């Protein structure tokens, strides 16, 4: 079954012939290779490009590596990258004329000196270069510097709920329940049956993500790293930092792990796109607060598999889904903080902080969003909108609930919508 990824395909099509290296990043198995080597490849063919002018090469494919005299097993044994000279010789053998050639290169981070190789291809007028990569440290964080302003990133996520519903055989209510449980990794979505989906997710975690992270970063104490993943999985959407996590290890695991080691492991997880962090932002002071942060999983199915599907908290899971959707749509997402001073019943002034779940920015557009699993009564609604009423600016304020409600604005101009409309209609918060 073909899964439509039009949102990302359109991004690639618009970037053709722009003189930049198109870099598709994202967690492994989110669909980058399928997007590049199937959907985009067939777009090129359907638009008159000859197959011999499309050069596809996957650096994690034993068959492709054989073509250039390399061995995947040997590379992994020796813990080294792929010889760039052998690869460039292969490309030269494929370029037979001055016509436009499209290079579709998969898992580019496995190639030694890939930055220099790609920059070299950019100097050729007849090459349009598209690559994928699964390591943020090698790609996302360095695109601007390594490619001297000539890198153009398209970050890809697992299936959004809207993409998921295109292949799900059921209504949106049951669909969201399954999506929040098993996530949107394409190969998992296409599996039949709960047991198969769960097994696939657990296998992905152990055989792909953990293995990649430990090998790439040469982690010696794999047990500590996995324990940290378990702690993060049990506390999605909770404020934390390396020092707090160190204390958790000390109390629960009787471990002497340092906060510096925990910080390093958190970086590894973010670099592999397994998790993302949201910083706190002082809305009144207009300044970022360095720590603590909130961490969200790029795929809820992976998070649930990590804790063996034992701890399914609808409130935090819904918050994670909303966060991922906002990031997929291109917003930067922070956690809003509003310092306030209030008098208690004895007249004593106390200082506290109100929280806005998400402060979303894209260019000059900003939204303040609260995730409220349910709004059973007016008391709960007032509680959810309380932080909004302390914000002095005119940016739109939105409450997203799982309750099936029609969109409405209250007397304060605050929009309430249901999560189904939010996830299935990308323009609903603009209306």
List each language-model region with its residue ranges.
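Short regulatory helix/loop adjacent to the ATP-binding pocket of P-loop NTPases
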Residues: 120, 137-153, 167-169
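Hydrophobic positions on the alpha1 helix immediately C-terminal to the Walker A/P-loop
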Residues: 35, 39
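A cross-kingdom feature that marks ATP-driven nucleic-acid transaction machinery
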Residues: 2, 25, 29, 33-34, ...
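Short glycine-rich substrate-engagement loop in P-loop NTPases that contacts/grips substrate
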Residues: 57-99
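Conserved catalytic segments around the Walker B and adjacent sensor/switch elements
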Residues: 45-61
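Interdomain hinge/linker elements that couple catalytic modules in large macromolecular machines
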Residues: 2, 157, 162-339, 351
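Pre-Walker A adenine-sensing motif
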Residues: 1-19
């Amino acid at each position: 079954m073909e899964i439509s990824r039009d949102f990302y395909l359109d991004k690639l099509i618009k970037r053709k012939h722009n003189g930049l290296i198109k870099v598709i990043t994202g967690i492994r198995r989110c669909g980058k290779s399928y997007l590049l080597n199937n959907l985009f490849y067939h777009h090129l063919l359907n638009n008159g490009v000859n197959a011999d002018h499309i050069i596809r090469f996957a650096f994690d494919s034993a068959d492709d590596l054989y073509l250039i005299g390399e061995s995947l097993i040997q590379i992994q044994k020796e813990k080294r990258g792929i010889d760039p000279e052998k690869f460039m010789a292969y490309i030269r053998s494929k370029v037979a004329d001055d016509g436009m050639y499209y290079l579709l290169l998969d898992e580019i981070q496995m190639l030694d000196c890939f930055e220099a190789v790609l920059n070299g291809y950019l100097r050729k007028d007849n090459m349009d270069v598209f690559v994928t990569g699964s390591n943020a440290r090698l790609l996302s964080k360095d695109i601007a510097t390594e490619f001297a302003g000539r890198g153009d990133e398209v970050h890809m996520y697992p299936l959004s709920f809207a993409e998921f519903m295109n292949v799900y055989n059921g209504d949106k209510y049951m669909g969201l329940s399954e999506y929040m449980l098993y996530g949107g990794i394409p190969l998992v979505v296409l599996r039949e049956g709960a047991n198969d989906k769960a097994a696939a997710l657990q296998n992905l975690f152990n055989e792909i993500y953990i293995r990649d992270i430990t090998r790439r970063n040469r982690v010696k104490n794999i047990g500590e790293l996995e324990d940290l993943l378990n702690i993060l999985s049990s506390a999605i959407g909770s404020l934390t930092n390396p020092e707090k996590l160190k204390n958790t290890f000390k109390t629960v695991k009787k471990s002497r792990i340092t906060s510096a080691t925990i910080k390093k492991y958190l970086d590894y997880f973010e670099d592999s796109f397994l998790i993302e962090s949201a910083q706190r932002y002082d809305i009144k002071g207009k300044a970022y607060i360095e720590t603590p942060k909130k961490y969200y999983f790029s795929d809820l199915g992976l998070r649930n598999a990590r804790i063996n599907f034992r701890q399914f908290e609808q409130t935090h899971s819904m918050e994670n889904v909303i966060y991922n959707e906002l990031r997929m749509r291109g917003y930067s997402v922070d956690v809003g903080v509003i310092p306030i001073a209030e008098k208690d019943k004895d007249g004593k002034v106390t200082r506290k902080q109100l929280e806005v779940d998400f402060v979303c920015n894209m260019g000059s557009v900003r939204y303040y969003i609260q995730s409220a699993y349910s709004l059973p009564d007016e008391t709960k609604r007032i509680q959810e909108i309380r932080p909004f009423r302390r914000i002095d600016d005119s940016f739109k304020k939105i409450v997203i609930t799982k309750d099936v409600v029609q969109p409405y604005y209250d007397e304060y101009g605050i929009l309430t919508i249901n999560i189904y409309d939010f996830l299935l209609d990308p323009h609903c918060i603009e209306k």
